[in-house]
Amino acid sequence: IPFIKAARHYCPDLKLWASPWSPPSWMKTNGHYAAASAGEDHDEKYRNGLPKEKEGHEGTDMMIQEPRYLKAYALYFQKFIRSYADEGIPIFAVMPQNEFNSAQIFPSCCWTARSLATFIGQYLGPAMMQEGVSVMMGTMERANTALVDTVLSGSQSAPYITGVGFQ
């Protein structure tokens, strides 16, 4: 927060967006911050303690897809937005998940495009609309237009998406 405030001192019109690397572990199917294991085959500093059998994989959902979890996660976003606003830092947009199609050894969470569309359309989109915050889809690190098309063509999710980000 101090660095953001310092940057805004020099650029008062600075626009900030936010994107989580992972939902809280208790909201994930594997109960771990990471989606891929980093065991004995990795340098000790990268080992994360995730057993191989609890790894996630691209094209699967690691976020628990129950309404109570999805509603709670949207509330996390709202509380984040409000907390930063209380510090004088407006957030103009959020992305529901950074690299949602990648299982990583660091904080990460795979989502299917269909589940992401449901989360945006029924939970995150309405919550962010209440806060006056846009929803962007991203970040996509591989050009898989089918994933984007699924979310952008969803009758519930599409109205909330204001942009798509690729890297």
Where are each of the predicted segments found?
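N-terminal catalytic cores of secreted or lumenal carbohydrate-active enzymes
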Residues: 1-91, 122
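Active-site neighborhood of glycoside hydrolase catalytic domains
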Residues: 69-167
